[in-house]
A protein has these predicted regions:
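Residue-level signal for inorganic ion chemistry
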Residues: 27, 75, 109
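Divalent metal-binding pocket/active-site signature
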Residues: 1-42, 52, 60, 81-85, ...
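Solvent-exposed polar/charged
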Residues: 18, 63-64, 100
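Short amphipathic alpha-helices and their capping/turn segments at secondary-structure boundaries
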Residues: 57-67
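Short acidic/histidine-rich active-site segments
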Residues: 68-85
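Mid-to-C-terminal alpha-helical segments outside catalytic/metal-binding sites
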Residues: 92-124
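Short acidic capping loops at alpha-helix termini that bridge into adjacent secondary structure
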Residues: 22, 68-71, 106-108
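A contiguous pocket-lining binding segment that forms or flanks enzyme active sites
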Residues: 47
């Protein structure tokens, strides 16, 4: 399992992982939608966090990730610009957003994300 922060290098990273025989998680992905779609085709997962909900680009990216490729992460304590200390409650806001996006109950979304984590751990 590779967890990659591809900031300012999404296209290069997607090109490099093409043909990789393992599981790739793109952490806090911020690249183009074109490269996002290519990464999805390559089987990548995407870890999203509370800060991504705070920007138009972050929300646009989340809206383009299939629910079966979503993972949650905090990036704490390294996330900057927070007005308050990062707590586990921030995950609830992410689940609420995803629930609204996919028009699914929060419990269904939580089970889906948990299943995604389990699948990642079972893959090569």
């Amino acid at each position: 399992i590779l967890s990659i922060h591809s900031r300012s290098a999404a296209k290069k990273v997607v090109n490099m992982i093409n043909g990789f025989d393992g599981t790739v998680i793109l952490h806090w992905y911020s690249g183009s939608i074109t490269d996002l779609r290519r990464a999805i085709e390559l089987g990548c997962y995407f870890s999203i966090n509370h800060q991504m909900l705070q920007s138009t680009n972050g929300r646009n990216i989340i809206e383009n990730i299939p629910v079966d490729r979503l993972l949650l992460e905090s990036d704490a304590p390294f996330t900057k610009g927070l007005k308050e200390k990062y707590t586990i409650d921030f995950n609830d806001e992410i689940y609420e957003y995803i629930s609204g996006l996919y028009q699914q109950e929060i419990d269904v979304v939580k089970k889906r994300v948990k299943a995604n984590f389990a699948k990642v751990l079972k893959e090569k």
